[in-house]
């Protein structure tokens, strides 16, 4: 039976490695969704190369540095898997590789939209070759931190803290994106192009996290405990962020809530096996507060531009999660020796956790600062202003768009929106009293009427114009918005500049049909009393020329049967 269980958990080990690999897709979707469409292809490429370059680096020497024969508690050493196929534990190699790739890919989002691709590739190779393997050896490879009792079950410190700290250094050295801060330093929200994609990425990551945290479980009880704590912490963190943003901004912030879910997952990672459900509940509350605070701190005090919240999620909550082990570890059945300050363990474990953070942070900060500095002074770290404005898809990869053939507009069913708008608001006055019609005529006998309205109103306006005898019109998709005094919108805690919304421009030229009838028909079709019903513009037309016949004026508007 023992042999069977060993085989079962060995298979589980590799299945969970596949779960963690799938998290690369989650990171790619979160980062792509939280950034602008002109950089989506670049984001995907960076996440792909994180894993591919990381595999090469890990194969050459990274795995040996992590899991090789311990040397003085500082580094592992042994033959490279590249030349020692028979002597390599390939289950361990695969498992540790996907964890290494996770640490590397965290940085992509914080440095998004302005980093040279070649520079990012160099960074990715270095962190997978040397930086991550050495500090991970201290924690999991038999190094000096593990001998002191440092507890980081699945990587709050070894993976997320390292990735988040590297992201902070990289984003700081890069500087903010163009338009992120006003001249007086006020931060401006730059919304990502698809929260839908970002949310998909968040759910993929949450799903993968069950493998991320549960992969090293050695029995069913421990696995069940890990699944429970890995569920409770992010759920509570998300609720916490929702309440904070709802109270602070008047409405719950979707992007921040997605960050809150990831923050809770990061914070519980270190102690997922060592805390109980109450501890994970408290950790969830703390991580929700932490992610909101760090986002505010970066934007309003440090002026560091982090497009996706990688620093707040991974650095801030990597620190928090590691410290919380020293506070809330309760000596579970599977980890009886791990007891935190609040469960009678005194300050010993807490002190070891703090020492581990200090050591890992110092190693990461020094090595990654040197790496980024050398890159900056050689190949350069940041693209030019022109390249940033055009977009990295075009300038770095020759890609016109990651969405070729798709219009990047909100495609919302018109009937649904009309039902919501028309049924939820009753105009205080009648149409003619609310918007009196007065058409001023000039000497011209031909007029052009331009109607700007929402796309979902097109069927109504077309039917209304057809009813008064207008069968010809020009319809164009345009973008625009009105500015309503006193309304302020926020994205991830920062005010958002004016955003353009998809509209339709309907143009008709009339000579026989009175302009007043056209205006009245349009008003009747569009009026709800809500902001955004649209606008009508009336112009005089000096002349009309039909190209096919040469007819001019009113004759050019007539069609022969």
Regions found by a protein language model. Give the residues of each.
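Positively charged, small/polar-rich N-terminal and surface patches that mediate targeting and assembly
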Residues: 395-402, 413-561
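Glycine- and aromatic-enriched membrane alpha-helices
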Residues: 1-439
């Amino acid at each position: 039976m023992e042999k069977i269980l060993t085989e079962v958990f060995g298979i589980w080990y590799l299945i969970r490695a596949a779960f963690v690999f799938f998290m690369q897709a989650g990171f790619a979707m979160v980062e792509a969704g939280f950034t602008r469409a002109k950089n989506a292809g670049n984001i995907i490429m960076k996440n792909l190369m994180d894993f591919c370059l990381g595999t090469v680096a890990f194969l050459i020497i990274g795995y040996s540095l992590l899991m090789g024969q311990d040397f003085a508690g500082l580094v592992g050493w042994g033959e490279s898997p590249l030349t020692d196929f028979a002597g390599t534990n390939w289950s361990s190699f695969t498992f540790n590789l996907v964890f290494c790739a996770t640490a590397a890919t965290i940085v992509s989002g914080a440095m998004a939209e302005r980093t040279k691709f070649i520079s990012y590739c160099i960074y990715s190779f270095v962190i997978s070759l040397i930086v991550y393997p050495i500090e991970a050896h201290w924690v999991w490879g038999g190094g000096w931190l593990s001998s002191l009792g440092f507890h980081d079950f699945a990587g709050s410190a070894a993976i997320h803290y390292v990735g988040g700290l590297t992201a902070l250094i990289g984003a700081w050295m890069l500087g903010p994106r163009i338009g992120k801060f006003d001249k007086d330093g006020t931060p401006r929200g730059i919304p990502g192009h698809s929260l839908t994609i970002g949310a998909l990425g968040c759910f993929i990551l949450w799903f993968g996290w069950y493998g991320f945290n549960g992969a090293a479980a050695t029995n069913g009880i421990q696995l069940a405990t890990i699944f429970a704590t890995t569920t409770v912490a992010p759920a509570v963190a998300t609720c916490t962020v929702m309440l904070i943003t709802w109270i602070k901004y008047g409405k719950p912030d979707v992007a921040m809530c997605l960050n809150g879910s990831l923050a809770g997952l990061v914070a519980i990672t270190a102690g997922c096996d060592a805390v109980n459900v109450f501890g994970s509940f408290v950790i969830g509350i703390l991580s929700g507060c932490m992610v909101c605070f760090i986002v505010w701190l970066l934007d309003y005090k440090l002026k560091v531009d982090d497009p996706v919240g990688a620093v707040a999620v991974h650095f801030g909550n990597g620190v928090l999660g590691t410290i919380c082990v020293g506070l809330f570890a309760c000596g579970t059945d599977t980890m009886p020796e791990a007891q935190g300050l609040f469960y009678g363990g005194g300050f010993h474990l807490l002190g070891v956790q703090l020492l581990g953070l200090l050591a890992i942070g110092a190693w990461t900060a020094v090595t990654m600062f040197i790496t980024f500095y050398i890159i900056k002074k050689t190949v350069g770290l940041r693209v030019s202003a022109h390249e940033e404005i055009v977009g990295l898809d075009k300038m770095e990869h020759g890609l016109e768009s990651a969405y070729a053939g798709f219009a990047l507009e909100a495609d919302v069913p018109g009937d649904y929106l009309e039902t919501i708008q028309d049924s939820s608001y009753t105009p205080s006055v009648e149409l003619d009293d609310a918007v009196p019609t007065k058409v001023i005529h000039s000497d011209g006998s031909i007029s052009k009427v331009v109607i700007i309205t929402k796309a979902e109103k097109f069927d109504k306006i077309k039917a209304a114009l057809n009813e008064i005898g207008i069968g010809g019109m020009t319809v164009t998709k345009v973008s625009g918005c009105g500015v309503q005094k006193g309304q302020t919108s926020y994205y991830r805690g920062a005010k958002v500049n004016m955003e353009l919304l998809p509209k339709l421009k309907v143009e008709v030229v009339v000579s026989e049909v009175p302009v007043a009838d056209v205006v009245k028909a349009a008003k009747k079709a569009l009026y709800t009393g809500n902001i955004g019903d649209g606008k009508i513009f009336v112009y005089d037309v000096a002349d009309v020329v039909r190209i096919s016949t040469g007819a001019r004026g009113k004759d050019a508007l007539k069609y022969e049967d």
